[in-house]
């Protein structure tokens, strides 16, 4: 990574009135011009990180850096960041122009320059011509665009977005996801986006930080996190998963459901207990005798693009299958999957331990025939 625009170094936060620790030794670096997402459930600490970057909250310990300089004691108005809040925080008595121009007027920017910059900012969010429109007469999506225009008009280095799409209906929220992502690419500004919506994070981000209980439990590209969840929490929080107990017999061979299957994972102890993850969309329905597993269909729901089928094997394990084929409740079906569809999770492994294990294992492999090496090389190229 080039010099990070934002960095957290061992940042913790404790609310003194309650004694609650909401951030625990947080470390990360943000590169300029990328779209980052802090993803987690309510109370995970994601908004606290955003507020510390903005200067709305102080870190209890640790350092917050902007362009390599410590900004813990720098006031809000001296930080080159701008926040878009969930409520948008627009002035209802002002029209669109005055809302967007507010900060420029405070800085006593010349009137002609204000008009030009407001017009350009509104054009960026497809609201040029709305300058005289009352805020009260705008739709939710239009108010969102005004808030974003106000955020970018000062050309900040970083834009912070605190669940800005959560109040919108599904269709409008999806449209705004596209618009926000395209806007960020055009501007080249670092966006830090907070959400509890996994699909939103996967769709928009260059890099995701998954948070739980004040800690970053995994970070990576959307593809990395979806395809290689680090633990049970991430696997269940990001998308739907079938998770079963298993045993890693040896490299590339795992046992679950009383059977042994080829996999693409290695670097673990022989006969080590693990958890096995197979995504619902990676399961193919076959004739019972042709499947690697046999299950009985319990129920199904039509989700528009696929049927969501719930089935049980003879050990009582529940299986979720996403299929374009409609099943018959009560029928026995076969399930087929490929070795690369099987994702192995060590029990209670941290992200640091995972990275160290993979690095050590790759060094042991021959480059020309090392499967793990090839996978890691591919992931490295995708992240470059």
From Swiss-Prot:
Coiled-coil blocks: none
Family: Belongs to the ABC transporter superfamily. Spermidine/putrescine importer (TC 3.A.1.11.1) family.
Gene that encodes it: potA
Keyword Magnesium (UniProt): no
Cellular localization per UniProt: Cell membrane
Superkingdom in the source lineage: Bacteria
Alphabetical UniProt keywords: ATP-binding, Cell membrane, Membrane, Nucleotide-binding, Translocase, Transport
Self-association state and partner proteins as the record states: The complex is composed of two ATP-binding proteins (PotA), two transmembrane proteins (PotB and PotC) and a solute-binding protein (PotD).
Domain ABC transporter, chain residue ranges per copy: 6-238
EC number assigned by the record: 7.6.2.11
Matching InterPro entries: AAA+_ATPase, ABC_SmlMolc_Importer, ABC_transporter-like_ATP-bd, ABC_transporter-like_CS, Mo/tungstate-bd_C_term_dom, P-loop_NTPase, Transp-assoc_OB_typ2
Name by which UniProt lists this protein: Spermidine/putrescine import ATP-binding protein PotA
GO MF annotation list: ABC-type polyamine transporter activity; ATP binding; ATP hydrolysis activity
Membrane topology listed for this record: Peripheral membrane protein
Organism listed in the record: Streptococcus thermophilus (strain ATCC BAA-250 / LMG 18311)
Enzyme class: translocase
Binding sites annotated in the UniProt record for ATP: 40-47
Catalysed reactions, semicolon-separated: ATP + H2O + polyamine-[polyamine-binding protein]Side 1 = ADP + phosphate + polyamineSide 2 + [polyamine-binding protein]Side 1
GO cellular component term of the entry, any: ATP-binding cassette (ABC) transporter complex
Job description of the protein: Part of the ABC transporter complex PotABCD involved in spermidine/putrescine import. Responsible for energy coupling to the transport system.
Record flagged with keyword Cell membrane: yes
